């Protein structure tokens, strides 16, 4: 069983760190699924607090890593699956936020315990030579017999999906609306309109976004709506550490809301907010 990956682009290193930092704010632990061409991070609802949603990130290896090698424990296995403290991994990667980082290696090792070693080559202002900053993050190797509990989630089939250009505005709005109602109703239609509705005993507050980009329409569907837990919605938006402003909101009527942030073409952060009974 072997895994080694190398990052060298400063922007890609910061994006990778921001993805892990987002997961850190949602749960203490996460799962890493290391494939031959793709890496996934998953935060399941049973790993997080009751107020956190299901979140996962898919990263195509060639986007971030000019060097990427994975060898599973057995020839018939396609992955290495690891359990890891998202907080510990986040702290190890925090060095990537600053300047002067030439490269960062990720390496699966067994020292006194299985670990992912984060090895950053950092230039300091007092020296022309780079120094290595090493963090060994303990991991749990999940055996193949348990993999069925750690499958990459399936993106739901949305009847309607809209692109929202201002993530910051929606984030601020949901943070306020969660104090009005325990649930939020999201309504979208083919006119490119999104309504976010919070209802209490005293009032109903409707916030409207218009002229949004229509990304998906299923058949002759004219509109779709779904109500979700306002705490879960707020937890997702509040955890985001990525600089991206664009967000895709897809609604699978009465089942779930799918939130998607395309960090770049083959690096995507997903969340599914399940419907609540009204």
Curated annotation (Swiss-Prot):
Family: Belongs to the HUS1 family.
Record's keyword terms, sorted: Cytoplasm, Nucleus
Tissue: Expressed in ovary.
Binding partners and assembly: Component of the 9-1-1 checkpoint clamp complex consisting of Rad9 isoform A, Rad1 and Hus1-like; the interactions with Rad1 and Rad9 are direct. This complex probably also forms with Rad9 isoform B, however 9-1-1 complex containing Rad9 isoform A localizes to the nuclear periphery.
One GO term (biological process): mitotic DNA replication checkpoint signaling
GO CC, alphabetical: checkpoint clamp complex; cytoplasm; nucleolus; site of double-strand break
Subcellular location: Cytoplasm; Nucleus envelope
Record function comment: Component of the 9-1-1 checkpoint clamp complex. Involved in both meiotic and somatic DNA damage responses. Essential for activation of the meiotic checkpoint in response to double-strand DNA breaks; required for the S-phase checkpoint but not the G2-M phase checkpoint. Involved in double strand break repair by homologous recombination during meiosis; influences the organization of chromosomal DNA in the meiotic nucleus.
Pfam families, A to Z: Hus1
Protein name from the UniProt record: Checkpoint protein Hus1-like
Main subcellular location: cytoplasm
Disruption phenotype: Viable but females are sterile. Aberrant formation of the karyosome, the compact spherical cluster of condensed chromosomes that forms in the oocyte nucleus during meiotic prophase. Aberrant synoptenemal complex disassembly in the oocyte; possibly contributing to the karyosome phenotype. The karyosome and synaptonemal complex phenotypes are caused by persistent DNA double stranded breaks that activate a CHK2 meiotic checkpoint pathway. Activation of the meiotic checkpoint leads to defective oocyte localization.
Disulfide bonds: none
